[in-house]
Amino acid sequence: MTALKNDRFLRALLREPVDTTPVWMMRQAGRYLPEYRETRAQAGDFLSLCKNTEFACEVTLQPLRRYDLDAAILFSDILTIPDALGLGLYFETGEGPKFKKTIRTEQDVLNLPNFNAKSDLDYVMNAVTTIHSALGGQVPLIGFSGSPWTLATYMVEGGSSKDFRYTKHMMYSQPEVLHALLDRLAVAVIDYLNAQIDAGAQAVQIFDSWGGALAHREYTEFSLNYMRKIVAGLQREKDGRRIPVILFTKGGGQWLEPMIATGADAIGLDWTTPLNVARKTVAGRVALQGNLDPAVLYGSAASIEKSVKAMLDDAYANGETTGYIANLGHGITQWVDPSQPKIFVDTVHEYSAKYLGS
């Protein structure tokens, strides 16, 4: 086991003292970086970029060369599981992910093949192993998966959606079919994340990107219950170290209490939930991660610094000095000037000394 030179991200997830606030950015490896665009051009297309071990490793490491980040996150796609289940993932320019097949009936669910993460997504595991080795203990590596609900929306809709018409039609007219699909996906996600942990991931995040599109009762029934099942099925310790689990539901700030009850170590927040309110609600029971509006990075240096300091003031307003990781409230956008995230990251580290005494 390689000793970590910087473990403050993991310590913060476990609500242990840190010398400065750890920070990373969702989608930190992405199109806003010119070196990423160059590597993607070499790969030929996005899926080839994901499926080539050397390219996936390279783009994972790129933001760490620019910014003083406290964690790396595996570069992959959220839809690897549906692709491995034979739905035929492809991308059209300007239109996002699409599937050649959709899941609309009970028979469609029954026809899904068996799934084994280590064999069906071996390219992901190879990437995790390679990245872990390349990091050399510099910072921890985060593995991830989409939540069952989020994966199901893409599988039922056949791609991205603004209103989730087919998925919600299934939810209200054939709930048993949707539950059957979600159960299959929960089992697959458990296998997938455990395989990533075996390959070297030191923390994992479940991205429930579309959970916020659900009504209160439906969120519990069709999203949260399956994330709870996943958390219960995950390997929580490896090589004598706890493997923290982060849940992130975009638009889910109103569901903090039931999210805490899943057994996750941390909850990610988007920018619509005040951090000071969330900290008071969770009362030290879990760590919190977030939640700068990614659009803040369009602003001037002074504007970014002001927003970051306000976020940190909120995070530490209640006197707690543990259990907080700075991040964006959603993924960084492709239009951000690559010089701007450095202001965000450096301000987090420098200003948090005011509260952490480092």
From Swiss-Prot:
Subcellular location field: Cytoplasm
Site (Transition state stabilizer): D77
Enzyme Commission designation: 4.1.1.37
Keyword terms: Cytoplasm, Decarboxylase, Lyase, Porphyrin biosynthesis
Main location: cytoplasm
Broad EC category: lyase
Gene3D superfamilies in the cross-refs: 3.20.20.210
One Gene Ontology term from the biological process aspect of the record: protoporphyrinogen IX biosynthetic process from glutamate
UniProt: substrate binding residues: R27, Q28, A29, G30, R31, D77, Y154, S209, H330
GO molecular function terms listed in the Swiss-Prot or TrEMBL record: uroporphyrinogen decarboxylase activity
An example Gene Ontology CC term for this record: cytosol
PROSITE patterns reported in the protein's UniProt record: UROD_1, UROD_2
Catalyzed reaction equations: uroporphyrinogen III + 4 H(+) = coproporphyrinogen III + 4 CO2
Xref: CDD domains: URO-D
Metabolic or biological pathway: Porphyrin-containing compound metabolism; protoporphyrin-IX biosynthesis; coproporphyrinogen-III from 5-aminolevulinate: step 4/4
Stored HAMAP family: URO_D
The family this protein is said to belong to: Belongs to the uroporphyrinogen decarboxylase family.
Purpose: Catalyzes the decarboxylation of four acetate groups of uroporphyrinogen-III to yield coproporphyrinogen-III.
Subunit record text: Homodimer.
Protein name: Uroporphyrinogen decarboxylase
Biological source species: Acinetobacter baylyi (strain ATCC 33305 / BD413 / ADP1)
